UniProtKB/Swiss-Prot annotation:
<keyword id="KW-0687">Ribonucleoprotein</keyword>
<dbReference type="GO" id="GO:0003735">
    <property type="term" value="F:structural constituent of ribosome"/>
</dbReference>
<comment type="subunit">
    <text>Part of the 50S ribosomal subunit; part of the 5S rRNA/L5/L18/L25 subcomplex. Contacts the 5S and 23S rRNAs.</text>
</comment>
<dbReference type="Pfam" id="PF00861">
    <property type="entry name" value="Ribosomal_L18p"/>
</dbReference>
<dbReference type="GO" id="GO:0008097">
    <property type="term" value="F:5S rRNA binding"/>
</dbReference>
<dbReference type="GO" id="GO:0006412">
    <property type="term" value="P:translation"/>
</dbReference>
<protein>
    <recommendedName>
        <fullName>Large ribosomal subunit protein uL18</fullName>
    </recommendedName>
</protein>
<comment type="similarity">
    <text>Belongs to the universal ribosomal protein uL18 family.</text>
</comment>
<keyword id="KW-0689">Ribosomal protein</keyword>
<keyword id="KW-0694">RNA-binding</keyword>
<dbReference type="GO" id="GO:0022625">
    <property type="term" value="C:cytosolic large ribosomal subunit"/>
</dbReference>
<dbReference type="InterPro" id="IPR005484">
    <property type="entry name" value="Ribosomal_uL18_bac/euk"/>
</dbReference>
<comment type="function">
    <text>This is one of the proteins that bind and probably mediate the attachment of the 5S RNA into the large ribosomal subunit, where it forms part of the central protuberance.</text>
</comment>
<dbReference type="InterPro" id="IPR004389">
    <property type="entry name" value="Ribosomal_uL18_bac-type"/>
</dbReference>
<keyword id="KW-0699">rRNA-binding</keyword>
Amino acid sequence: MALSPRESAAKRAQRVRTRLKSLANGRPRLSVFRSSKNIYAQVIDDERGVTLASASTLEAEGKGADKDAAAAVGKLVAERAIEKGVKDVVFDRGSYIFHGRVKALADAAREAGLNF
């Protein structure tokens, strides 16, 4: 029986997260969630189970869900993570392909000083 779209996305996200665990080496992960109206990013320390920094289009300058708003979120989450002393992260794209808004967020976070 074929998987539903929700089950397929969960399976993709789990596959990505499993690979990240082997690559992390104690680094926190930059997790991205994308909805039709907003984009959210968090820097999460999985060893302690704590969110170190977060940002979304709900609070960033560019409200909405376009590439410019995603870039603003990437810059904001990177600045907040660097304030907390986090410079090295692993990028968790979840079930999303590395394209469009997700790529814009990642590029802006790299430009703002995060290494991944």
